[in-house]
Amino acid sequence: MASNNDSIKKTLGVVVGLSLVCSIIVSTAAVGLRDQQKANAVLDKQSKIVEVAGIDAEGKKVPELFAEYIEPRLVDFKTGDFVEKAEDGSTAANYDQRKAAKDPAESIKLTADEDKAKILRRANTGIVYLVKNGDDISKVIIPVHGNGLWSMMYAFVAVETDGNTVSGITYYEQGETPGLGGEVENPVWRAQFVGKKLFDENHKPAIKIVKGGAPEGSEHGVDGLSGATLTGNGVQGTFDFWLGDMGFGPFLAKVRDGGLN
């Protein structure tokens, strides 16, 4: 009988030991996978910034191009001025605007009238990306986001140094319907933005997503997405908010006045 008990104890010991080893392996793998996912997300974002900046990536790795041509800077949304650190002490190199927007100490809750992009909260500090060639700044890239039909849509908009002319746009995260709202990623649709003016003569946000098609030669109009009116409305709200006084409006006003020089 004692022999049977010893056998059972040994079996249980082996099972427990294997379980512990397996749990350690799984935990280690999960941590490694999470780190890899974070690294991939950073690389993807850098790739999109390099793309919308119009930088020729041939023959060089994205991190090298990003380090050479892109300078992240922090901006105080209220004043439009550059700042060295965010409220949590982060610098442009490690600032997480999404995380800040969720923290009541580092963000503001938007009223229904203010919240044209349907994002609920806005961080007090934003990040922009200066496109540089040596000491010269050729463009500025602003990150924008707004709610579509099914998802929050995140994009980068490249703006010339006049603070008004679009040189490119790319969506890097969205979950809209493939073939409909998901066409925000279509290069043909995105190409319509190039050369458009963000503001009218009174410096008010002027980009218009036009259902049925923008008039030919329109300075501000972009064709709506066929069969995706609500996604188009989300794109419209995104531009209305982020070009306005609660978004990058004050910063872009300073860019127009030569604030990058």
UniProtKB/Swiss-Prot annotation:
Domain of life of the source: Bacteria
Localization of this protein: Cell inner membrane
Sections of the chain in a coiled coil: none
Catalytic activity: a ubiquinone + n Na(+)(in) + NADH + H(+) = a ubiquinol + n Na(+)(out) + NAD(+)
Keywords recorded for this protein, A-Z: Cell inner membrane, Cell membrane, Flavoprotein, FMN, Ion transport, Membrane, NAD, Phosphoprotein, Sodium, Sodium transport, Translocase, Transmembrane, Transmembrane helix, Transport, Ubiquinone
The enzyme's E.C. designation: 7.2.1.1
Membrane-crossing residue ranges in chain numbering: 12-32
GO cellular component: plasma membrane
Required co-factors: FMN
Signal peptide: none
PANTHER family assigned to the protein according to its UniProt record, in alphabetical order: NA(+)-TRANSLOCATING NADH-QUINONE REDUCTASE SUBUNIT C
Name this polypeptide is given: Na(+)-translocating NADH-quinone reductase subunit C
Primary gene name: nqrC
